[in-house]
Amino acid sequence: MPDVISSLDSVTPELLTSIFRRNGLLGQGRILDVKFHPNPAFNSVAAHLEPVYSEDAPADVPERLFIKIKQNHWGRDEVAFYRLVTGQKPPPSMLIPLIDGAYDKETGVSHCLMLDVSGTHHAPVSRERILAGDGVPEEEELAGCVDALAGLHAYWWEHSALRDGPVRIPPPFRDEERYMTEVRCQTEEWRRFRKTAGGELPRELIKLYERRIEALPTLWDRYLKHRFDCFSQFTACHSDCYFTQFLCPDDPEVHGTYLSDMEEVCVCLGAEDLVYLIATFWTREQRQENDRETRCLTRYYESLVKRGVKNYSWDDLCGDYRLQLIWRVELPVWDQQNGSTRDYWRLKMQCLVDAYRDWDCATLL
């Protein structure tokens, strides 16, 4: 296992030269200097790097790199996943190639050193646009995001490397005991939410959440246990899959769409990511405009099938989407209890609740 890079000060020309040689990127020559361009990030130290090479370095060495360094074990699963990816042939094309990654379980520090694609790619929408209620990408970029997500899911669909590998099923779904522990946590979280913010919600919304909390204990046996026990129709999920996590190509004829920031990667139903992508910050009007939601789900499903996914019907997808809406409609409650602003969690709650109702999720309880 490579040594962990714990700070940007550690990123010296000598270190990068060693990393490049170890990974077969620099057969001759060396790195003479490194130019740093810091990149503000929520929970990591990140920077764009420009190596300066000696004249005898190969012509095809990477011109720009991106590094992120995380503390408190936040990067553990991301490093494990990317290292798993590097062993796959061919590697999944929607993931930015990793050059080097390491995690120290004693200190909780990790790093990922990757190719920098910021010169050829851009985010389809900004966080500011999403929070302003303008989170729908341009049609071509939306299609690219859906295709990239379907590609990720199809690649890892019931993949043998996920059964006993480093990417794991989320704790609440590993067994009944942990599921019921999560139910108790959500029940207590809802109780605190009602006390601090419930007064501003309409009665019918309170009833919707109360009914969900009451039904949660029954969902394990009815919908979840057999799926997780049999590893049925599972894949690698991003699990924080907002549009800000995608990077769309400036020139689609040359490059494809990437998914980034795999910090929350897990083994789950693919609909987990679809709910984040479609239902979390799109209003009812945005989902229904020109059947946008249905078109996205249809495109996703058809892409799965084209990529070889079998024994998964359209009805299966719709059922999973409804099930994940039931699970994720709790997100804004968690957000409010963990310090998110009112504007943030209220917008998310309205979007998720509208989708929950439109898909008649209460009938599954």
Where are the language model's segments positioned?
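Conserved NTP-binding catalytic cores of kinases and kinase-like/nucleotidyltransferase enzymes
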Residues: M1-S110, P249-T257
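Active-site acidic catalytic loop and adjacent metal/ATP-binding pocket
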Residues: P40-A57, P217-G270
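ATP-dependent phospho-/nucleotidyl transfer catalytic cores
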Residues: V125-G151, W157-H238, P249-P252, L365
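Active-site activation/catalytic loop segments of kinase-like enzymes and analogous catalytic loops
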Residues: A80, E264-G308, L325-Y344
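Short helix/strand-bridging catalytic loops that position acidic/His residues to coordinate divalent metals
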Residues: E128-P137, L259-E264, T280-R284
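Extended catalytic cores and adjacent scaffolds of nucleotide/polyanion-binding enzymes
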Residues: R307-C318, I326-L365
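Generic recognition of stable, solvent-exposed alpha-helical segments in well-folded globular domains
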Residues: D77, E140, G144-D147, A236, ...
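ATP-binding pocket architecture of kinase catalytic cores
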Residues: D60-A80, L84-V167
